[in-house]
Amino acid sequence: MSNLKKILSLLLALGLIAAFMTACNKQTTGTEKVTEEAAQTAESGETAKVEDVTVYNKQENPETVIMVVSFGTSFNDSRVKTIGGIESAIAKAFPNYEVRRAFTSQIIIDKLAERDNVDIDNVTEALDRAVADGVKNLVVQPTHLMNGYEYTDLKEELEKYSDQFDSIKLGEPLLTSDSDYEAVIKAITEDMKDYDDGETAIAFMGHGTEADSNGVYAKLQEKITAAGYKNYVIGTVEAEPSIDDVIAFAKAGSYKRVVLHPLMVVAGDHANNDMAGDEDDSWKSLLEKEGFEVVPVLEGLGQNEAIQQIYVQHVSALL
């Protein structure tokens, strides 16, 4: 009888242990699932439902249309705040004109259509739509940072439609004239002033390009330094200056902290991964490895109201 009690007690104990292990496993699995879902929704923006507007100030049979052309991004929250912010500012400034959206990246267009059921025209589709709608005058404002390959491709595409409209006018990229540089410097330094404590390097990450237009980064660096912001540094993710230059700058200035901000219209893949990601080769990781405190700011230039107004001024010059 005593042996039977021992066996029953042992079985009961084993049962309790098994139940405990199962519960722990379920809890761990649940946590992993939540973490995985959070990672998946970071890009799609499902945590905060967003609404894309692709046509503003909609009119019947508009003679003149403003088309805002962007590369695009699949990061929904950033797209609404940045590209949407620029488009909205233009629409508000010119309420008598219909404003339409077009993207140049077919990969992003296809991804948004498949993942989110969001339909956005590419440039050719937007031009064909304008022709079909009987639009006579087209004002095209790109949100590009510089006059590089993307801008050249857009210009060539518009030339194919020169006989389809009474007029096609193409606006300038963000950084074109000296006054543009001055306005951008004022906008970004005002936006970052709360981080400027004398012990912090403020680094802006641009995309970079093999085109001659890559020189805009050196020019912006020269002008921002000349304006007295000697703790500001410009780098690029795919060209020169590079993260190595940013690290050297931060070391030379004996800075303790580095604030990272995209020098891009949107805070998309480059900002979230190449700049602020946890991978070993991200700017954040490389700077932390060198002993710096790193503060990533995941905000695209397009959500800065002062930057939005520069694009508004470029459109105004065409109307």
Locate the predicted segments by residue.
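Bacterial N-terminal signal peptides that target proteins for export
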Residues: 1-11
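Active-site-proximal alpha-helix that buttresses catalytic centers in soluble enzyme cores
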Residues: 25-319
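Extended amphipathic secondary-structure runs
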Residues: 10-13, 81
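Alpha-helical transmembrane segments
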Residues: 14-18
